[in-house]
Design a protein with these regions (language model features):
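Conserved strand-helix element at the start of the C-terminal RecA-like helicase core
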Residues: 82-107
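Interdomain hinge/linker at the junction between the two RecA-like core domains of SF2 helicases
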Residues: 15, 19, 30-85
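Loop/turn-to-beta-strand initiation segments
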Residues: 19-25, 88, 139-142
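Conserved nucleotide-binding/hydrolysis micro-motifs of P-loop NTPases
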Residues: 24, 30-34, 71-75, 96-99, ...
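Conserved RecA-like helicase motor core of SF1/SF2 enzymes
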Residues: 112-125, 130-132, 140-177
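Short, conserved "post-DEAD/DEAH" coupling segment immediately C-terminal to helicase motif II
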Residues: 2-22
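Generic beta-strand/beta-sheet core signal
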Residues: 1, 25-27, 92-94, 115, ...
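Short glycine-/polar-rich loops that comprise or flank the Walker A/P-loop
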Residues: 20-22, 61-65, 109-111, 155-159
Length: 177
């Protein structure tokens, strides 16, 4: 919701609760905590209670991804070296050009996979099938990809590196971990 619409929307909700005895359920994947936000002030006088008791504990238990931002840019060669050091890793880059620049750092005989829209759908499916089998078998899998893997692709790597980009894309990449 655009920030400028929050106050008027909450005013309408408060009016519905106070004047018409309406019950309002706020539900979102990223709901802010009421204790730490202006929502508490905006909804003054309304009874606010969590439907799920101990929700913070649920988040802690389900926390499975660690985000790290590198303090300095990494060269393509340094990135390739990091990929080589890992048993199973996926690197997601923003452009096909960037993916190819990283791939250029590898010798032809090195075991590296590539996915992007430079490949036709049939070839991408074939590569994905091979990757799935190798991940399941615990074999080495090093994948350099574009954003093509961020939606509609079921991959589960122990480690994912993502080029800086919009937050929703970074979160999407974390879903591949």
């Amino acid at each position: 919701m655009p920030p400028e619409l929050l106050s008027p929307t909450l005013d309408v909700l408060r009016c519905l609760v106070e004047d018409y005895s309406v019950t309002v359920v706020l539900s979102t994947a990223t709901q802010p905590t009421f204790e730490e936000s202006r929502l508490l002030r905006e909804l003054a006088g309304c009874e606010i209670r969590e439907i799920v008791e101990g929700y913070a504990e649920h988040f802690r238990v389900l926390e499975r991804v660690e985000y790290r931002v590198l303090p300095e840019p990494v060269s393509w060669q340094d990135l390739a070296d990091e990929i080589r050091r890992r048993h199973q890793v996926m690197v997601i880059l923003n452009t096909r050009r960037d993916a190819l620049a990283v791939l250029d750092q590898f010798d032809e005989d090195e075991d590296i996979f590539h996915l992007s829209t430079l490949l036709c759908g049939a070839h991408r499916r074939e590569i994905l099938k091979t990757i799935h089998c190798r991940l399941k078998a615990g074999e080495p899998v090093r994948l350099v990809s574009t954003q093509v893997v961020e939606a509609g692709v079921d991959l589960d790597f122990p480690e994912v590196w993502r080029a800086i980009g919009p937050l929703d894309r970074i979160v999407q990449a974390a879903g591949r971990c």
